[in-house]
Swiss-Prot record:
CDD domains linked to this entry: MnmA_TRMU-like
Annotated function: Catalyzes the 2-thiolation of uridine at the wobble position (U34) of tRNA, leading to the formation of s(2)U34.
Protein name per Swiss-Prot or TrEMBL: tRNA-specific 2-thiouridylase MnmA
Stated family: Belongs to the MnmA/TRMU family.
Organism: Bradyrhizobium sp. (strain ORS 278)
Entry annotation: catalytic residues: C113 (nucleophile), C210 (cysteine persulfide intermediate)
Gene that specifies this protein: mnmA
Record InterPro entries: MnmA-like (IPR004506), MnmA-like_C (IPR046885), MnmA-like_central (IPR046884), MnmA-like_central_sf (IPR023382), Rossmann-like_a/b/a_fold (IPR014729)
């Protein structure tokens, strides 16, 4: 007989570590599991120390959040520990963030934080504490498959779904993780917080990059990678100089505003040339692509990745967290993979994630994903497309 976490044994005999950020979601996660009788231990990670951020609405992981997490733990009567991960976070997340921008990419630091810190280091700590699982307040769900493994699926609350940021979760990590809020909406979570009489019930959600207290990410990049803030030229597709810029880190693919140049028609950033420090701009149609190359592909679908894509795998992909999944197919082998977009996309930026799903909406299963290495120009992206025969089977939850 399995308990509510799909584990054998009584809740009171099952230790669960909850990653407590000090926000309402992780606090309700801890409260729910405690109310169900589990042996809950709360852990909060101190990831950085920015004085301005400690009391700033919209930031997360700062001093006030640690205080809030501790108060919730006391309210629930559970042990609570604060672990200093500042050095690890700086090396794995902040330094990589700055390096990515300096190389002309637009990174997603939350993905690396989940992969390296929360689901890497913290998961290891949870095991050392004798926990059977690590639970988080992410809006995503997992389902037990017939063979006992788990599938990662989208959350019930589509507006809050965080599956895009968790594509790099490995199968081994997924087996150990639980997401109790996956079947709830945000209003339901806040209502539970009030029922549990948690002080954070109406606390603002985190919105900013947690280690950028002012919201100006270029401050961090300029300090760690000053070369990314060196001035250069803004040119059109033919190399004609249109203006000047104060650092490629100020720009991202698809950007239109803030170019500071006069033109007869709207111009968009279509390329960042790190070698020449040039920002290349062009018309909107120059942003369109049908083919994306990927790196660091993670596969959590059924079977082995190369076997799944041998004849091309039809699926759905999301190339930004704010965009809906679009039909595509995946092909490649031996670590080299490409995604071909059926309808094409605009403004695909290197450094962002391309996440694989088995359906375009609903409780779709996450099949994995990779980081975007490059977007092939439209003129060469549509040649020789061969429709795949293998189709991903959706998981019904």
């Amino acid at each position: 007989m399995l308990n509510s976490l799909d584990l054998e044994g009584r809740p009171e005999d099952t230790r669960v570590v909850v990653a407590m950020s000090g926000g309402v979601d992780s606090s309700v996660t801890a409260a729910l599991l405690k109310s169900q009788g589990y042996d809950v231990v709360g852990i909060t990670l101190q990831l950085y120390d920015h004085g301005a951020a400690t009391h700033r609405k919209g930031a997360c992981c700062a001093g006030q959040d640690i205080h809030d997490a501790r108060n919730v733990a006391e309210r629930l009567g559970i042990p609570h520990y604060v672990l200093d991960y500042e050095d690890r976070f700086r090396e794995s997340v902040i330094d990589n963030f700055a390096a990515s921008y300096a190389s002309g990419e637009t990174p997603v630091p939350c993905i690396e934080c989940n992969r390296a810190i929360k689901f890497g280091d913290l998961l290891k700590t949870a095991r050392e504490l004798g926990a059977s699982v690590l639970a988080t307040g992410h809006y995503v769900a997992s389902r037990r498959l017939p063979d006992g493994s788990r599938a990662l699926t989208c959350a019930a609350d589509a507006d809050r779904d965080q599956s895009y940021f968790l594509f790099a979760t490995t199968r081994e990590q997924l087996d150990y993780l639980r997401f109790p809020l996956g079947d709830m909406t945000k209003p339901e979570v806040r209502e539970l917080a009030r029922r549990f009489e948690l002080e954070v019930a109406d606390k603002h959600d985190s919105q900013d990059i947690c280690f950028v207290p002012t919201g100006r990410y270029t401050d961090i990049i300029g300090k760690l990678r000053p070369n990314a803030m060196e001035p250069g030229e803004i040119v059109d597709l033919n190399g004609r100089v249109l203006g000047a810029h104060q650092g490629i880190a100020n720009y991202t693919i698809g950007q239109r505003k803030g170019l500071g140049i006069a033109a007869g028609a709207p111009l968009y950033v279509v390329k960042l040339d790190v070698t020449t420090r040039r920002v290349v701009v062009g018309p909107r149609e120059a942003l369109r692509t049908h083919r994306i190359t990927l790196r660091e592909v993670n596969w959590i679908g059924d079977g082995a990745l190369d076997a799944a894509v041998r004849d091309g795998l039809e699926l759905f992909v999301r190339v930004r967290s704010t965009r809906a999944p679009q039909p595509a197919w995946l092909r490649g082998a031996d670590g080299s993979y490409e995604v071909e977009l059926v309808g094409g996309e605009e403004g695909v930026s290197p450094g962002q994630a391309c996440v694989f799903y088995d359906a375009a909406s609903g409780r779709a299963r996450v099949l994995g994903g990779g980081f975007i290495q490059s977007a092939v120009a439209e003129s060469s992206a549509t040649a020789g497309l061969v429709r795949p025969q293998r189709v991903a089977e959706p998981v019904r939850g």
